[in-house]
């Protein structure tokens, strides 16, 4: 079994507005190993996106903790969490969130700029990642000049440009047609093999989830089962 990379222990998340309390996550516990490909499957409103926000240090659990590479996130300062997100974690969303006034190359380079890498290293690595996703010929194009599938490929290149140990993906193919969705998941698998990056993908699509090596089901804020989707149709 792969060495544990990320572990969450009894995560709970509750929101309160006035006297109204809403429990979104209930005692969620699981782990993901180095280089593992995992899917969390659930319908809209099941708590999947909230879970990813907690795992990425973008929000704080009401109780429980997230442990990344042996280090509890509850012990990290805001600055340390930001550095962790820049250096060790990658994020892919249903919407690409590319900066519209920047080229594909500049968008991919952004995490390296934030990390204050040297200019020559930034350019070389950003071009390397565009090549990895098959878009080196679109380096100077802005998002408005790219197709939906191309924009998502640029977003994936940006998420992986710092060679993170784990990528958190929230419905990464939700805005794509079947052909482009299939292409994106093929790409994630290839990058996993080439870079050893672990992927945690949340999705409602069983056909996409079954491509991952492990699948968990989330329902009403609880992880209810480990799924076997080899025969999913």
UniProtKB/Swiss-Prot annotation:
Entry's Gene Ontology molecular function annotations: ATP binding; ATP hydrolysis activity; transmembrane transporter activity
Q: What InterPro entries does the database record attribute to this sequence?
A: AAA+_ATPase (IPR003593), ABC_transporter-like_ATP-bd (IPR003439), ABC_transporter-like_CS (IPR017871), ABC_transpr_LolD-like (IPR015854), LolD_lipo_ATP-bd (IPR011924), MacB-like_ATP-bd (IPR017911), P-loop_NTPase (IPR027417)
Which keywords label this protein?
ATP-binding, Cell inner membrane, Cell membrane, Membrane, Nucleotide-binding, Translocase, Transport
ABC transporter domain span: 6-233
Location of this chain's protein in the cell: Cell inner membrane
Query: Quick one: which residues bind ATP?
Result: 42-49
Q: Which GO terms describe its biological process?
A: lipoprotein localization to outer membrane; protein localization to outer membrane; transmembrane transport
Q: How does it sit in the membrane?
A: Peripheral membrane protein
EC class of this enzyme?
translocase
Xref: PROSITE patterns: ABC_TRANSPORTER_1 (PS00211), ABC_TRANSPORTER_2 (PS50893), LOLD (PS51244)
Disulfide linkages recorded for this protein, renumbered to the chain, are: none
Record EC number: 7.6.2.-
* CDD domains membership: ABC_MJ0796_LolCDE_FtsE
What family does the entry list?
A: Belongs to the ABC transporter superfamily. Lipoprotein translocase (TC 3.A.1.125) family.
Described purpose of this protein according to its UniProt entry: Part of the ABC transporter complex LolCDE involved in the translocation of mature outer membrane-directed lipoproteins, from the inner membrane to the periplasmic chaperone, LolA. Responsible for the formation of the LolA-lipoprotein complex in an ATP-dependent manner.
Indicate what this protein is called per its UniProt record.
Lipoprotein-releasing system ATP-binding protein LolD
């Amino acid at each position: 079994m792969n060495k544990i990379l990320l572990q969450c222990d009894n995560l709970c998340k509750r929101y309160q507005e006035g006297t109204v309390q809403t429990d979104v996550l209930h005692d969620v516990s699981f782990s993901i190993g180095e280089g593992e490909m995992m899917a969390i499957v659930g319908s809209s409103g099941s708590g999947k996106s909230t879970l990813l926000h907690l795992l990425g240090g973008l929000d704080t659990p009401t109780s429980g903790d997230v442990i990344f590479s042996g280090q509890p996130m509850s012990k990290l300062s805001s600055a340390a969490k930001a550095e962790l997100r820049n250096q060790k974690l990658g994020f892919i969303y249903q919407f690409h969130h590319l900066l519209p006034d920047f080229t594909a190359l500049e968008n991919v380079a952004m995490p390296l700029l934030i990390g204050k890498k040297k200019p020559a290293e930034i350019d070389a690595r950003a071009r390397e990642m565009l090549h990895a996703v098959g878009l080196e010929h679109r380096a100077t194009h802005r998002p408005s000049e790219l197709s939906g599938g191309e924009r998502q490929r640029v977003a994936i290149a940006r998420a992986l440009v710092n060679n993170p140990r784990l990528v958190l993906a929230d419905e990464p193919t939700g805005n794509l047609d079947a052909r482009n969705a299939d292409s994106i998941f093929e790409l994630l698998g290839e990058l996993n093999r080439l870079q050893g990056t672990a992927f945690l993908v949340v999705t409602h699509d069983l056909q996409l989830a079954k491509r991952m090596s492990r699948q968990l089901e989330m329902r009403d804020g609880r992880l209810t089962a480990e799924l076997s989707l080899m025969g999913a149709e």
